[in-house]
Amino acid sequence: MCCEDVDAPQNNVAARVPFTRTGSIPRVFRPPPPPRIDLSLKIGILTVSDRAAAGEYETGDLSGPAVENSLTSNMGKLNSRRSQSDGTTAMINFVAKAIVRDEIEEIKGQLLSWCGKDRVGGSGMDIIFTTGGTGFSPRDITPEATLEVIERECSGLMSFVAAECASIQPLAALSRGTAGICGTTIIANLPGNPNGVGQCLDILVPLLLHAVKDLKHG
């Protein structure tokens, strides 16, 4: 489900509820037209998971690659729409990936580094996606770490995403993910479930392109 972390135990009721995905985006959601400006994006993908950081998964980290794959798919769809209208494009020219434990200082340290806050005059990523640690487990502290890093909160963004996702899977409403701005970087918390990641990004990516445009270009 959308808010279920990959670390969640499989012996509880919530973990046994199958993820329901009837389409790539909820029927009630209509993506806004892409911004009419060329965008070249630097993306950070941060997996927050004790077990992934310890290398305990036989398959390796799944949620981080799910973020990258969904981003690539969504950007392709949006660029198809853009080229048909005005010829502008949004390109991902750099992707950084990392895995940290569910520890506030580790999460904060990586976020601040990617925001360019660890060097004088350093430029950061355009968007950072975290995946994992947004649920109700005592170790789910990604939103708390994010709030200690961001300078301006954009809580309405993830509230909207959660509401749209809940129209497909009601348990998506249990996600505590937030979003905000640190310098010129937008940070957004995604769930740790790979399917939930895709569902959220179907909604989030079209909105974030406008957010980046406003933040970087006014």
Where are these regions (language model features)?
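Non-catalytic beta/alpha edge segments that cap or flank active sites
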Residues: 1-218
